[in-house]
From Swiss-Prot:
Binding residues annotated for [4Fe-4S] cluster, in chain numbering: C22, C26, C29
Top EC class of this enzyme: oxidoreductase
Organism: Methylobacterium nodulans (strain LMG 21967 / CNCM I-2342 / ORS 2060)
Cofactor binding summary note: Binds 1 [4Fe-4S] cluster. The cluster is coordinated with 3 cysteines and an exchangeable S-adenosyl-L-methionine.
Name recorded for this polypeptide: PqqA peptide cyclase
UniProt-listed Gene3D superfamilies: Aldolase class I
Gene Ontology BP term (one): pyrroloquinoline quinone biosynthetic process
CDD domains xref list: Radical_SAM, SPASM_PqqE
């Protein structure tokens, strides 16, 4: 008897990377090393068509991101299109530059939610990490206005060696600013973070302590603040399901219109990414070679293929497998069943123990930095 092919579920969310332009230069940015220039960005009408196709496909949430999405002159128009289509819009912003000046217009256009990044709870450290002076004062003013308008506010804090001691202070900051949710997201080492890994990697003892702080705060602040925690892969026992599983829940549209299964997928050579300027979104979701490549479980090698967790973590991260093992189809080295797992943990311990961390290689458009070689490329 032939096996029945399961119906492909619709994606839940779409990450709309409207631009790679950003006033911050964070060394852990998940954007690609080769950033799209302004001249390559999709125009307003194309984004509106993409949003309409997303709604028809069944997408519920649109994450308006970048770079800094408010750098787009048409961000209000794009947000209004989301509202007109019944799409829940989430603005992922640095809160600096043009963000505050456009906030009320975004609110009037129907914006549903704001996610505001904080590089540090301390102004000087925030400037050092983000590479922008006077950023903190702009963020405070932006957060205050978001709450005054009645918009739900989530703070996002990417945690690494340079700010891991501030987790308690960042939790207090979220409460003080009136946020409903805080994301304590340990750095995921893709994009610029992979280049800066040795400068960003925290000690395992510090990671464990930060997790205990979050767990205590969750109990203490129950009903006041929801705290999400993303733990670092290099110290994990099992990998996370990348983007909820490759090609299962999310899709990412780049500023130039490429549609990716995850934001780092372009690091995998040989994948064919379809563009919204050439294909309808539904066609891309169902038939794009890039989405098909690692969707489901048939592509898996052992030990993933026979693992009881194969439909929980879906093999972990393909981009991380490539970066660390030299093979995108390999077991994610974050998994304890990977032959590289112990080596990767030892690498993290060694980098975190550096007495003086290397200088940051800041995110910039034009001229990608040198990329570390895969740990397992010659294994």
């Amino acid at each position: 008897m032939n096996a029945v092919t399961p119906t492909l579920p619709a994606p839940i969310g779409l990450l709309a990377e409207l631009t790679h332009r950003c006033p911050l230069r964070c060394p852990y940015c998940s954007n690609p090393l080769e950033l799209d220039k302004r001249s390559a960005e999709l125009d307003t009408a194309t984004w509106q068509r993409v949003l309409a196709e997303a709604a028809a496909l069944g997408v519920l949430h649109i994450h308006l991101s970048g770079g800094e999405p408010t750098a787009r002159q048409d961000i209000v128009e794009i947000t209004r299109t989301c509202a007109d289509l019944g799409l829940y819009s989430n603005l992922i912003t640095s809160g600096v530059g043009a963000a505050l000046g456009k906030l009320e217009a975004l609110y009037d256009a129907g914006l549903d939610h704001v996610q505001l990044s904080f590089q540090s709870a301390e102004a000087g450290n925030a400037e050092r990490i983000g590479g922008l002076k006077n950023a903190q004062a702009q963020k405070f003013a932006f957060a205050e206005r978001v709450v005054a308008l009645g918009l739900p506010l989530t703070l996002n804090a990417v945690i690494h060696r340079g700010n891991i001691d501030e987790v308690p202070t960042l939790i207090d900051l979220a409460v003080t600013l009136g946020a409903k949710r805080l994301e304590v997201a340990h750095t995921q080492y893709y994009g610029w973070a992979y280049v800066n890994r040795a400068a960003l990697m925290p000690a395992k003892a510090d990671v464990d302590r930060s997790i205990r702080v979050v767990e205590e705060a969750r109990e203490r602040l129950k009903g006041r603040l929801v705290i999400d925690l993303v733990v670092p892969d290099y110290y994990a026992k099992y990998p996370k399901a990348c983007a909820g599983g490759w090609g299962r829940r999310l899709m990412n549209v780049t500023p130039a219109g490429k549609v990716l299964p995850c934001h780092a997928a372009e690091t995998i050579p040989g994948l064919e990414f379809w563009n919204v300027q050439d294909h309808a979104l539904a066609d891309i979701w169902a038939h794009s070679p890039a989405f098909q490549a690692y969707r489901g479980t048939s592509w898996m090698k052992e030990p993933c293929r026979s693992c009881d967790r194969r439909e929980k973590d879906w093999g972990g991260c393909r981009c991380q497998a490539l970066a660390l093992a030299g093979d995108a189809a390999a077991t994610d080295p974050a998994c304890s069943l990977s032959p590289l797992h112990a080596k990767i943990q030892a690498l993290a311990i060694a980098e975190s123990a550096l007495e003086i961390a290397p200088d940051y290689q800041y995110r910039t458009i034009g001229g990608a930095p040198a990329v570390p070689q895969p740990e397992g490329a010659s294994a």
